[in-house]
Amino acid sequence: MLVLISDLHLGDGTTGSSIPTSAFQLFAKRLRLDAHFASAQGERYRPIEELDVILLGDILEVLHSNRWLYAVGDETRARMTRPGESDYIRPWSDPTDPKYAAKLLEVTRAILEANKDSFEIMRKLASGEAIEFDAPDEHGNRDRNSDKKIPLKVRFHYMVGNHDWYYYLKGGSFDVIRREIIQALGLSNLPEPFPFDLRKMDKNFPWEEDSAPAIRKLFEEYRVFARHGDLHDKFNFNRERGRGYPTLGDLLGVEVINKYPEVLKTMPGIDPLFAQNPSESADVRPGFAAPLYVKAQLH
């Protein structure tokens, strides 16, 4: 059984609210029901042995965190960093700068903490604690009275999109971050760069296909193919260089959508409630419609 999910945008709470834990509880319930339904097709009862969930990008909302506006470790958020300053770091900065991985780790840990109850549900699904089947009897029928249960471990596979492409970056410092994500979400990924594209749409594209053999095997087995849709968005994907590079969308997200509410908070005479409302513009899709949302708030 294969399930694909994308665009959960689970953030650290600094620019908007994430979907509640109750949504994950409902997801686990639906997944359990579907697994049981798939195990009892026709007159035969055969508990399924595999259930894979592909997280198809923009699962963790890394881009829309106002932590990018401040120095690494600055929890006071009293002063935004500026270009040219020694503590300045943004998604489009040089990823080999030690501050880059440090800031990404800071943002990632904040996201994992803010959504820890939701991720606990994922871990229980992955460990086999959330879905189990009645064992079949000697005739292959479902034995509802049997004390023996067959647990099903859900395998979660992470692929990146344009709001979490930072987990595609190579290097030991980024492997450390990915390990924390794997542990927190119960992923089946290795700590190497999370994949983006397993089949180039155009052979002339300059980047290489990602390997990800486990995901590739699923695509072949189920005769499907999937990638995040940013490949078709020129503002959020660089077709000349590939997924491991920043785009105009990163700049808009940090310096406009994230920054505007933070600037309002520092202006005298601004109602704190009004200053908070524009932070929800991070949830506006597409991102370029955010100014329309802000204009509506002004009225």
Language model features with spans:
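Extended recognition/assembly regions associated with phosphoester-bond processing machinery
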Residues: M1-H299
